[in-house]
Every structure is written in structure tokens, then in C-alpha cells.
């Protein structure tokens, strides 16, 4: 008889895959000339995976890892967009000089054995 599965094992594995995907996404963005400002920024009611800057543009980046790039692309729903928007507003409140830059919400989609897909302006930041 098999012992009962560790209930937290799946959560830990998913978390680990997410961290790996974020690291890969950051590498891809840095190769494109972006400079990291923050990683896994959390504020009340929201979280942003990556905050990067290139020139006068700051991008709040949501990273999604799925079995296929298409599945990753459909994983950013209205609730996730709202959470990223809340966190972006909180980050801007802490960094007022950033308001003088171009702000956008990007996405990076990650799938096994595929080059990550960066989608600039993937969605609107609510309330900006």
C-alpha cells in the first residue's frame, strides 16, 4: 500500500516551477535590454512577478508557465489582471519618480522546450 501523498508537495513543486519560469523570463528580458527593478513584489491584494525597466519604460510583468505557450497565454484572467493592477499602483505609490515614465503591463509565457514569449502591453493596468 502506498503512503498518503504529501498534501504540500504539489504546491511546493508548482512554486518551484514558477520560480524557475520567472528566472527564465528575467533572463530573456535582460537579453532584450531590460533592467530588473523588483522581483515578486507583493502588496495588499496583489503581486507582480517582475518589474523591469528599459529606457523610459517600466513594465510590470506577469509570468505564466504552462504545458504550452497557448495555455499560458489564456491563464491571465480578469482577477489576475486586477491583482497586478493593485500591486502596480502600490509600487508606484512607493516610487513616485517612476510616474514620469511610460508604464505598461507585459506578460511572458513559458512552456517546456520552447523559447519564452514576451508580450508587451499584454493588458491594461487598471486605475492608471
From Swiss-Prot:
List, alphabetically, the InterPro entries matched: Restrct_endonuc-II-like, tRNA_endonuc-like_dom_sf, UPF0102_YraN-like
Annotated GO molecular function terms are: nucleic acid binding
NCBIfam families given in the database record: PRK12497.1-5, PRK14679.1
* Family designation: Belongs to the UPF0102 family.
Q: State what protein this is by name.
A: UPF0102 protein Mchl_0439
Originating organism: Methylorubrum extorquens (strain CM4 / NCIMB 13688) (Methylobacterium extorquens)
Amino acid at each position: 500500500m502506498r503512503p498518503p501523498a504529501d498534501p504540500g508537495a504539489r504546491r511546493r513543486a508548482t512554486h518551484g516551477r514558477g520560480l524557475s519560469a520567472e528566472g527564465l523570463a528575467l533572463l530573456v528580458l535582460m537579453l532584450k535590454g531590460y533592467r530588473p527593478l523588483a522581483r515578486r513584489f507583493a502588496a495588499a491584494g496583489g503581486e507582480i512577478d517582475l518589474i523591469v525597466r528599459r529606457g523610459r519604460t517600466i513594465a510590470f510583468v506577469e509570468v505564466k508557465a504552462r504545458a504550452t505557450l497557448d495555455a499560458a497565454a489564456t491563464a491571465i484572467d480578469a482577477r489576475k489582471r486586477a491583482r497586478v493592477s493593485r500591486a502596480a499602483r502600490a509600487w508606484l505609490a512607493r516610487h513616485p519618480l517612476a510616474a514620469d515614465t511610460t508604464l505598461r503591463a507585459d506578460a511572458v509565457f513559458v512552456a517546456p522546450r520552447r523559447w519564452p514569449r514576451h508580450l508587451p502591453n499584454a493588458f491594461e493596468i487598471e486605475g492608471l
